[in-house]
Design a protein with these regions (language model features):
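Short glycine- and acidic-rich boundary segments immediately preceding or forming the N-terminal edge
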Residues: 9-47, 417-419
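Metallocarboxypeptidase
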Residues: 36, 46-48, 67, 109, ...
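Short proline/glycine- and polar residue-rich coil/turn motifs
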Residues: 42, 501-509
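Active-site/substrate-binding loop(s) of hydrolase catalytic cores
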Residues: 60-63, 75-79, 83-294
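Short amphipathic, basic-aromatic surface patches that mediate peripheral association
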Residues: 459-474
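Short, hydrophobic beta-strand segments
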Residues: 513-521
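Terminal connector regions
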Residues: 522-552
């Protein structure tokens, strides 16, 4: 979590969605054994999966998916995805002393870098503007026309910025700390200005920007505690081609055990934990009592993920800093509750903290959160702010145009995104290491006489994460794990199901499976198979006499 120091003269730049795809295509061409690109269902522009694994060995593996932000006004996550993939493939080459080469044989990493491709490209357009969601024509003012009255470059300076109207009792006041910052007044406080984005009254209804370019916030379009009151909500959830394509891909790939939703600006890692528990209702007929310890195990895993995050990024919490809220219907909650995957939001950067030596003395009226954020952005990115200039507006008369650009205060600089990707890659590496990895660690036999043996197989999870979250196990999300004693004429099954299942195996824990068999020759081999949606296929063969001695 960082902002880099001063940038070099050769500053990095953000790439369009088409350019991002072209760079991934180059990686796939250069490293066909490690990198494959798969179009998501529906063939929506910008929606594809970059799959990194040892593709020469096409076996099922647990997978971690990295999403390049579901907000169209954030550019840095897609660039970070590209930089992370590049670094992983360099490290995965077998002729280098690397760590990722071994992991990509047992874990698959999937990047979906540009879920909101069309919207993010507007930020890079000739007259940049920011749209948070996927583009969708909407009639916001119910005049039977769509998107006809939105932001425009009124003064022709090539930039869309703010427009302020001087009015006694207006909604905004000038900051006493810096005249560049306009602060929304507290209730009962009289301001000096009204503030809007640049625009005209294009449809002659007396309003400005009341029907801008329509969009649906993809980040909150998923059917989990969805709300039509959420800003940018559609009429119903998951009606967009983008949300359907993502959902279809996730459902078709149940091996996805963890997901990272990369975001641009924020604070600490947030881990999806399900619906907050409501206060317990009075005892009564028909009331369901939740099982004891409901969600406790997933909270433990969430705490472990937070620890991994701090250890691998150097993140230091700040006083008064609260976790970011992703709102209703967000993708992380949906992945956790509907798909049974550990899901988290990872923020590449946060606002720079004032240097300790520059801290002002304790104030009676400290700045509001928005005021403090504006003041820090003025220090960090003064080029995103324009001086106010007088202008004669066709509808509003004498106004001033300037202030913040429409695309300001949403993203880190490209060089910062590339540097932040290094920290994100360290966290991704730690997550690969923590992912559930199953191994047959022991086969034991007890001689019951007359060629009969009691057999016990021990299956261990050598990762820190559970095979699936506790919520998935309690909700009966279908992620079966099967252990089979393969049928063989030489080995007769006396008791025990030939194919047995385990609901879950916690990180660092074991599960045991037992059979009673009869062998004509105690040195004949038995064959065992382990199969699951989130594990590599495992096989083990041993004779009853070749097994370890049974220990009670």
């Amino acid at each position: 979590m960082l902002f880099a120091a001063a940038l070099s003269a050769q500053e990095a730049k953000y790439l369009s969605s088409t350019e991002i795809r072209a760079e991934f295509d180059k990686l796939a061409k250069a490293e066909p054994d490690w990198c494959k690109i798969e179009e998501l269902p529906g063939k929506v522009f910008g929606l594809y999966a970059v799959r990194l694994a040892r593709h020469k060995e096409p076996v099922n593996r647990p997978a971690i998916v990295v999403l390049g932000s579901l907000r169209g006004d954030e550019l840095s996550p897609a660039l970070a995805c590209l930089e992370m993939a590049r670094a992983m493939l360099v490290r995965a080459k077998p002729d280098l002393p690397v760590r990722f080469g071994a992991w990509l044989q047992v874990v698959e990493v999937i990047f979906i870098p540009t879920p909101c491709a069309s919207s993010r490209d507007l930020v890079l357009g000739a007259k940049p503007t920011a749209v948070a969601g996927v583009l969708a024509p909407l009639d916001d003012d119910r005049d039977l026309a769509t998107d006809e009255d939105g932001l425009e470059d009124v003064n022709g300076d090539g930039v869309i910025s703010q427009l302020r109207i001087k009015r006694q009792g207006g909604r905004y006041r000038v900051s006493s700390r810096d005249v560049c910052a306009l602060i929304e007044c507290a209730p009962g406080e009289l301001g000096a200005y009204d503030l809007i984005w640049e625009g005209f009254d294009n449809d002659g209804d007396g309003q400005i920007n009341e029907d801008p370019r329509g969009s649906i916030t993809l980040a909150n379009d998923f059917a989990i505690r969805w709300s039509d009151k959420q800003p940018g909500a559609n009429r119903f959830p998951m009606l967009t081609a983008e949300s359907r394509a993502l959902a279809d891909f996730f459902v078709a790939h149940p091996n996805i055990s963890a997901a990272i939703n990369l975001r641009s600006l924020g604070g600490a890692l947030t881990v999806a934990g399900g619906q907050p528990q409501a206060p317990e209702a009075p005892a009564g007929r028909g009331r369901r009592t939740p099982p004891q310890g409901d969600g406790a195990r997933d909270k433990q895993v969430g705490d472990a993920l937070q620890k991994l995050f701090v250890e691998n990024t150097g993140y230091k919490p700040r006083q008064g800093e609260e976790p970011e809220s992703e709102g209703a219907g967000n993708v992380a909650d949906w992945l956790y509750e509907a798909c049974g995957a550990y899901a988290m939001n990872y923020y590449l950067a946060r606002l720079p903290e004032p240097e300790k030596g520059d801290k002002p003395p304790r104030e009676e009226n400290p700045p509001t959160k928005d005021e403090a954020a504006q003041l820090e952005w003025l220090k960090h990115a003064p080029e995103d702010y324009l001086e106010w200039k007088s202008f004669k507006h066709a509808t509003l008369g004498d106004v001033e145009i300037g202030g913040w650009k429409a695309v300001a205060r949403r993203d880190v600089k490209p060089a910062h995104a590339i540097e932040a990707a290094t920290k994100a890659l360290d966290f991704l590496w730690a997550l690969c290491d923590a992912t559930a990895r199953l191994r047959i660690t022991k086969l034991e036999a007890k001689d019951l006489g007359d060629g009969t043996f009691k057999i016990r197989l021990t299956l261990s999870n050598e990762g820190a994460l559970d095979y699936k979250p506790q919520h998935a196990a309690q909700s009966r999300i279908g992620l079966p794990l099967w252990v089979t004693l393969v049928e063989d004429k030489k080995i007769e099954l006396v008791s025990g199901a030939r194919r047995q299942s385990a609901e879950n195996i916690n990180g660092g824990a074991t599960a045991t499976f037992e059979w009673v068999v009869r062998a004509k020759d105690p040195f004949d081999f038995m064959k065992f198979k382990v199969e699951g949606e989130r594990c590599m296929p495992l096989e083990e063969s041993k004779s009853p006499k070749g097994c370890e001695e049974w220990k009670e």
